[in-house]
């Protein structure tokens, strides 16, 4: 293997992950009918609560490492012993500033990727939305806000455009 082959392999893999034409994409391209009133209200809340500060870019995240529990101590509330994974980026850097700092996940197709958080403790989008509001911005969302934010997150699911990878050496 050489660097060029590895890079080509990664590029090919990434092409299989493309999921364009989400309803959110269609809305951004000018289709005002692509999203419902609740979904648009969720998008407004997403911006109001500064979610896009971390969930930014085409993939709506995945570009930075952020601290979990800025406003409340998630790990104390969880009520279980800390694990190696709870250390976040600290595992690699050994820099105390990186303890509990994890990569911000991209939100594209987030409705398909449960469970949530680095430890899988949040089983549904409703749960993760409430938890993120509490631990990251210090807000207790009401049921309507949760419903609208979750509705918006569902608009980020795109149409799968890739192809399944096939192992030619696979014996049936």
Language-model features and meaning:
Residues 1-33:
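Extracytoplasmic redox metalloprotein regions
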Residues 22-123, 127-130, 137-139, 164-172:
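Short glycine/threonine-rich turn/loop motifs
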Residues 148-172:
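A cross-kingdom marker for long, charged
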Residues 102-105, 146-150:
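Active-site lining segments that contact anionic ligands and/or coordinate catalytic metals
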Residues 57, 135, 155-159:
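Generic structural signal for alpha-helix termini and adjacent loop/cap motifs
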